[in-house]
A protein has these predicted regions:
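Catalytic donor-sugar/metal-binding loop of nucleotide-sugar-dependent glycosyltransferases
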Residues: 199-213
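Short aromatic/basic micro-patch
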Residues: 22, 101, 170, 221-222
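Conserved core of the sugar-phosphate nucleotidyltransferase
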Residues: 62, 102-188, 195-197, 206
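Short glycine-enriched, charge-decorated loop/helix-capping segments at active-site entrances
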Residues: 16-22, 183-186
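An accessory alpha-helical subdomain
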Residues: 189-194, 213-223
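Short beta-strand/turn micro-motifs composed of small residues
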Residues: 5, 48, 96, 123-124
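Conserved N-terminal catalytic core of the sugar/cofactor nucleotidyltransferase
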Residues: 26-112
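N-terminal nucleotide-binding beta1-loop-alpha1 segment
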Residues: 1-14
């Protein structure tokens, strides 16, 4: 399991690291760790920015492998940092530390959904999807995702799409290595987007399937 926690959280307007802001008396990262532990993963890997490594001492009660993303090169780069420490056939659930309400039962359902797929993406319909990556299907009812387009790269038509990427992805180490190695940073932010693995997987004739969840509130990230 990989938890991405290296985001700067500029919109929080606070000197406190984003993932350390409290929700219901616990930090956002601790909420995600609690849900993660319930799934009994073989390992929990958390990716941090070097600037907030001091938060490690707050999680001494958890068995965590910490990883440092020295430069903010994007989510694909953050995952790439962890992969060499994992077994090639290991299954990987990718979570974000700023989704504190994520439910372990939903994650368990997601992990076991469509077991023969190569990549799984947890999605949600939002009435106000601004800021989220949009899910692109060749046909509206099709059970295969062709690509995920980030808000900053989407055209006006794509911005009208309500189905959004939660960021939660499930695959295996070998597949992720293969796909991430081909991710490029030719976008407006010059970052390596993890979402680009979807279109790359399609080019490789891999099966990328979405699980559209109705649990909207538990899947929303915290930005302010």
């Amino acid at each position: 399991m990989i938890i991405l926690a290296a985001g700067k959280g500029k919109r929080m307007h606070s000197s406190l690291p984003k993932v350390m802001h409290k929700v219901g008396g616990k930090s956002m990262l601790e909420h995600v760790l609690i849900s993660a532990k319930k799934l009994n993963p073989s390992s929990i890997n958390v990716v941090l920015s070097p600037k907030i490594e001091s938060i490690k001492k707050s999680f001494g009660g958890y068995d965590i492998a910490w990883h440092s993303q020295s430069e903010q090169k994007g989510t694909a780069d953050a995952v790439k940092i962890v992969l060499p420490s994992l077994k090639k056939d290991e299954k990987v659930l990718i979570l974000y530390a700023d989704t504190p309400l994520i439910d372990s039962n939903l994650l368990d359902k997601f992990i076991n959904y469509m077991p023969k797929s190569d990549v799984k993406v947890l999605t949600v319909n939002l009435e106000k999807p601004f800021g989220y990556g949009r899910i692109i299907r060749e046909q509206a009812e099709e059970e295969i995702i062709s690509k995920i387009i980030e808000e900053t790269e989407a055209d006006d038509l794509q911005k009208n799409i309500k189905e959004c990427n939660t960021g939660i992805i499930f695959s295996d180490v070998s597949t992720l290595n293969s796909l991430i190695s081909e991710v490029k940073n030719d976008n407006s932010k010059k970052e390596f987007y993890l979402t680009d693995i979807v279109s790359i997987a399609n080019l490789k004739n891999m099966m990328v399937v979405p699980l559209l969840s109705k649990e909207t509130n538990s899947l929303l990230g915290v930005n302010d």
